[in-house]
């Protein structure tokens, strides 16, 4: 299903653009499984600076490339991340599936919570206005107006309650590993709840999501090893792909 494949397209766009900026080949970093062939995207960008991709992905790639030329790799990542999640949300809305729309909201909430905690730990709250994503259960404005130590209260009514409490502690120097694990577990819990539905779309879509996540993990591990990445970098990519 395309919704579960979008993230591969944006991963590959990031790899292609950053490799070009560094003057190296992205081969070994590209992942299969996206809506568009990764090798074709690489060749098109290298030869003509264009991509066979969705309109949203092409627009985001052009903006990201411009930011990389201005030596703003963080800005490039943020533009592509925002476009990726926006495409996922739009596609979920088109399906009219409450399960899929809730799944994407869960992913956006987890991404925003991670962003808020990392910004607090690094003392870089100025990045929040352009880093936080629209479309979650908690608004970017609400997150920006909340002190890091009170993130648990802001997300307390949802699936990220435990993660938010650990995030509040991590923002002040607590364990980042426990916080990241809790974010992953919250998404797993959302899928697990759907598995208990005996019939209906949830059962099928939950199965697809679980299989896609397993395939994603295998691809990232194998690609990372082939590229000589450290175990820590591979673990980071696994978290970001969830």
Regions found by a protein language model. Name each.
Residues 1-242:
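Extended alpha-helical surfaces
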């Amino acid at each position: 299903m395309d919704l579960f494949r979008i993230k591969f397209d944006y991963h590959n766009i990031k790899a292609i653009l950053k490799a070009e900026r560094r003057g190296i080949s992205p081969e070994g970093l590209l992942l299969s499984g996206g809506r568009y062939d990764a090798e074709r995207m690489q060749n098109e960008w290298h030869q003509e600076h264009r991509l066979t991709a969705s309109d949203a992905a092409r627009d985001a790639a052009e903006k990201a490339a411009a930011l990389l030329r201005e030596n703003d790799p963080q800005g490039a990542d943020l533009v592509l991340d925002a476009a990726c999640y926006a495409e996922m949300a739009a596609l979920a809305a088109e399906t009219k599936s409450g399960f899929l729309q809730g799944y994407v909201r869960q992913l956006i909430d987890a991404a925003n919570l991670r962003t808020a905690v990392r910004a607090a730990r690094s003392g870089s709250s100025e990045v929040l206005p352009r880093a936080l994503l629209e479309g979650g259960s908690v608004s970017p404005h609400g997150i920006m107006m909340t002190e890091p130590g009170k993130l648990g209260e802001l997300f307390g009514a949802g699936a990220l309650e435990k993660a938010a409490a650990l995030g509040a502690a991590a923002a002040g120097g607590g364990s980042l590993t426990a916080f990241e694990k809790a974010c992953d577990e919250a998404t797993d819990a959302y899928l697990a709840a759907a598995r208990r539905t005996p019939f209906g779309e949830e059962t099928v879509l939950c199965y697809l999501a679980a299989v896609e996540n397993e395939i994603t993990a295998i691809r990232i591990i194998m690609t990372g090893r082939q590229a000589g990445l450290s175990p820590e970098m591979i673990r980071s990519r696994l978290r970001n792909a969830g």
